[in-house]
Amino acid sequence: MISKSDIEEVLSRYNTDKVSICTICSHTALQIFHGARVEGFKTIGICTEDREQLYKSFPQAKPDKIITVEKYSEILDPKFQDILKKNNVVIIPHGSFIEYVGPENISEEFTVPMFGNRQSLAWESDRERQRKWIESAGLIMPCKYKDPSEIDGKVFVKFPGAKGGKGFFTVNSENDFYDELNRRVKSGVIEETDVTKIGIQEFLLGVRYYPHYFYSLFEDSGMAAGKGNVQILGIDRRIEPIDEAYRGLPDVPPEFFDYTVTGNQPVVLRESLLPEVLSFGVNVVDASIKLFPPGIIGAFCLETIYHPSRGFVVFEISARIVAGTNVYAGGSQYSQFTYKEPMSMGRRIAREIKIGLKEQTLSEIIC
C-alpha cells in the first residue's frame, strides 16, 4: 500500500505556489472546479472526449485545463501520473473516481497526492469493514443476512462500490432473490464479480436523509472531534425511479422498481433532530481515528433512514464528497449558519487545502 511518506516525498517536490485542483470529469466535478476557482486555484479536468463539450459549457465551473483520455483507468499509467505531478496536482476523489479507477488501485498504484485519507476509501468500498466502522461509532445499522437462505421477510439487496443504486433490488424469499440476481447478471446490469460481494439487509421503513459532513483539522467551527471539528454543510435525499411507484399509479410496471439514483433533492431536518445527526458525524470521525489513523479527513456522508418509532438507522457511509452536495453549489441552509459567503462542499474542500498551503500544514490533509 502507498504510504504517507511516499506522498509526502511527492509533495516535497511541488511548487506550492502553483498547486492545481484536479478530478475526473464526472459526479461532482463541476462543483469541485467551481469551488476551487472561487478559492483562487487553477483546475485540471481529466475527461473523455464525449464529455468535453459539457465541461466547457459552464464558464464559472469549467476546468482551466482539460486532459483527454480514452478511458479513466489511464490515470494509473506512471507516465500519466508524472504529468499530473508536474502540474502540482491535488486530486479530489469522488464516487465516479473510485468506481472507474478502483479502490485497490488507488491504494496500491496511484501515487499522486489526494485530498483526504485514501484508507477511508478502502473502508467505504468493503461492506464488512464499512459495517465495522459504523458499528464502532455506536450507530444502529440494519440487520444483516449472511446467506440468501436466511431471508424470512422483505430485504434490500446491494452491491459493492459507488454504483449509485444500480442493480439494487428488494425481495421476500430465497427463490425471489436468485430470480432477481440471475436476471440482472444476464442483462449485464451487474458483473459476475459483484455477486461474490453481495450485501443483504433488512428492508427499512422511514424517511431517507443523507447529511453531508466535513471534518476539518484547521477550522474551529462545528462540533469537536479528534484533533479538529465536524461541520454539517447540507442534507439531501435521492431521487430514484422507485419513488414514482408510490404515487398512486395503477398497475405499476416492473421497470419503476429500480433504485438507480437519477437526481437529488435538498432537505431540511427538524431542528430538534440536528444534535443527534451532528453527533453521528463526530462518532464516525472518532471511530475512524481508532480504526485507520489518522482517520477520515474532509467530506463524508451518512445514508440514513428515520422513523419516529425507531429513530435513525445508518445503512451506509460515503467517505468522500457525494453527488447530493450538488444541490448546494451556491451554499446550503446549514452552511450559511457557519459562513458569511456561499460555501459548497467543493469550495469547502478547496478552502481546507488553501489553509493548509498558507499554514504549511498541507501534508496533514493529503495522502
Residue ranges and their predicted role:
Residues 1-10:
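Positively charged, low-complexity intrinsically disordered leader regions
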Residues 29-34, 53-54:
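Short N-terminal binding/cap micro-motifs at the start of the first secondary-structure element
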Residues 41-50:
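Short internal beta-strands
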Residues 49-156, 162-163, 173:
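Conserved N-proximal alpha/beta basic substrate-recognition cap immediately N-terminal to
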Residues 73-74, 120-233, 271-282:
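Active-site nucleotide/adenylate-binding loops and adjacent lid/helix of ATP-dependent enzymes
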Residues 154-158, 212-213, 304, 310-321:
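A short beta-strand motif that forms the metal-chelation/ATP-contact edge
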Residues 201, 292-309:
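A short glycine-rich, hydrophobically flanked beta-strand micro-motif that places a catalytic Asp/Glu
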Residues 213-288, 318-350:
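ATP-dependent carboxylate/phosphate-activation module, predominantly the ATP-grasp catalytic core
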